[in-house]
Regions:
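Long, contiguous binding/interaction regions
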Residues: 1-43, 47-72
């Protein structure tokens, strides 16, 4: 299964390797479709591929870290 989402990183999380952590800790493949990152905000269009349960775990991880997740 594939799912595309927009991620909006708050200032506090911009420099954290959250995409790396998701790829390492969950059985999902991440594909950055588009991104714009500054010191104040990070905007990422991301495609997640994997089992639905693993994709949901990855999304919940982002939310717990303060990232806004919106479906595309």
């Amino acid at each position: 299964m594939k799912k595309r989402v927009y991620l909006t990183y708050p200032k506090e999380q911009v420099k954290e390797p959250l995409l790396y952590q998701v790829g390492k800790n969950f059985a999902v493949v991440t594909n950055i479709r588009q991104a714009s990152v500054s010191d104040k905000i990070g905007l990422v269009a991301l495609e997640l591929e994997g089992e639905p349960e693993e994709i949901e775990k990855a999304i919940q991880f982002f939310i717990q870290k303060g990232v806004t997740v919106e479906p595309i």
